[in-house]
Amino acid sequence: MLKTYKLLTGSVTYLMVEYERDLKKILIWLLGGSRGGLMRLKILLLLKKRPMNPNQLARVLNVNYRTVIYHLELLERYGLVNKLDIGYGAPYFISDKLEKRWDLIRDVMRILGINEREEMEEGGEP
């Protein structure tokens, strides 16, 4: 998933720059460079507002439940969302890692020419 870097200089800053560069690349691929990227972005934008379970997301986005599950599992695999519980209907929320670096989402949206407000209007709001 993410590369591991040796710190030859002992500088933590170097590690953070490389980590953020990798995170930005991952976001560009997940949100713009692969099929379903726009759906994943809409899911992230909704979860940024409040935690939601897959059924709620499917209803708001007007898509199949399995479609939402597929995208949530992918986002979870890359550490961008977390599930509150293991059970059915458990809510998902934005991970701390992504919450702290939400500016990268905005950067990626700018790179891809996506307007956050327009996406929320198209995808619906809870």
State what each model feature region is.
Residues L41-L45:
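Pre-recognition alpha-helix immediately N-terminal to the DNA-recognition helix
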Residues G37, D85-P91:
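Short, Lys/Arg-rich nucleic-acid/phosphate-binding segment
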Residues T4-L27, D96-P126:
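Amphipathic alpha-helical dimerization/coiled-coil segments
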Residues G32-R40, E99:
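Short helix-coil-helix linker/hinge
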Residues L38, K49-N53:
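Short capping segments at the starts of secondary-structure elements
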Residues G79:
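Glycine-centered, phosphate/nucleic-acid-interacting loop/turn motifs that mediate DNA/RNA or nucleotide
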Residues Q56-V60:
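A short acidic, leucine-rich amphipathic alpha-helix
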